[in-house]
Every structure is written in structure tokens, then in C-alpha cells.
Amino acid sequence: LSDNPYQQLIVWNPEEEEIVGGYRFIDGATVAGGKGNPQDDLSMGHYFQFSKQFLEDYLPYSIELGRSWVQPKYQPAVDPRKGMFALDNIWDGLGAIVLKYENMRHFYGKVTMYPSYDRNARNWVLNFLGHYFPDAEGLMHPIVQAELPKLPELEQHFPIDQTDFSTSFKKGLRNLGKLTSEFGES
């Protein structure tokens, strides 16, 4: 076990007296200031090589978000109302973490895209993220580089207006929703 174990955000339904779901997280400051090696101790370290700049300038002010989960009764496919309740309360819990760790400026973590997710839709999502949120500082590098085709019509669907990033991002996000729905994904 690590000297700095992950913590769990637990979402509780007081009316049903049961756990709804949770989120695993770790305070980067405890890892950065600890005896261990962040590259070995953090889940993201198994997938990404951290830069010196990340370890020194970002990790002490970051929360790594790990695996989130929702128990079966609260899955949207089982009960849409309970599914919305679960998601809303997990987001409220993340808000509580923001308030509790007020010196944290960055939240990061990995996202799992299952093989069953349409490959074309996945390529659009990944190109969208890389287009609007590039790692310009080279803070992390994948240990295993994934093949990602660059889509020729990227600029057409995902405009970037440096004078009004918010508006161009919203337009790109709407376009992403349309593109992924064409492949049966949301």
C-alpha cells in the first residue's frame, strides 16, 4: 500500500439509507510532499509520464480524480430519475471537495472509453479535446501512444476564435454532440 492512499467521496441517499455511488481522489500535495514516488503512487502515473514541471508546479496544487462509480439501482439505464439524482449528487460532492481543498487549482484524471463505444465517435471526441485543450506545456506524455487519426474537417466543425473562445467552444461542443449522435453515441 502507498504511504498516501486515495480517499473516497461517498454519495449517500438519506431517504433510502444507502450508498448511491462514489469517487476516488487524492490530494496531490500529500503525494508531492511525501516519501513516495508520484510516478509510482498515482494511478495516472501508470499511463502517463509526468514532466518535472508538472511534479513541481502543478501536482502540489492538484487533485487527481480516480474511478467513479454508481451502484446498479442508480444507473440511468435502470432508473433515469435515480440516475440523474446520482450524477447530480456526485457533482455536488466534487463541489464539496473544491471547497474543502481551497488551495487546489487543478483537477485532473483519466477517462475510460470502452471498446464498444463507436470508433468514429471516439475519434471525434478525442480530436475535440486535443483541439480545444492541447497540452501546450507538455505536462504529461502517454506511456503508450495511441493512434489517433487527424480528421481533415476538424477546423470546420471545431472553430477557435481567440477573441471569443467561449462562444467558439460552445459551437464546437454543439457540433460534437451532433457528430457523435450520427454514430449512435451521446
Feature locations, PLM:
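Anionic group-transfer/hydrolysis microenvironments
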Residues: L1, E15, I26, G66-W69
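A short helix-loop-beta-strand connector motif used in the catalytic cores of GNAT acetyltransferases and
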Residues: S2-L9, G33-G34
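Residues that flank catalytic or metal-binding motifs in active/ligand-binding sites
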Residues: P5-Q7, G21, Y61
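Extended hydrophobic secondary-structure segments that form protein cores and membrane-embedded regions
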Residues: Q8-V11, Y108-K110
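Conserved beta-strand in the GNAT
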Residues: I10, E17-I26
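Short, solvent-exposed loop/turn segments that connect beta-strands within catalytic domains
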Residues: E15-E18, A77
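Acyl-donor binding region in acyl/amide transferases
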Residues: T30-S186
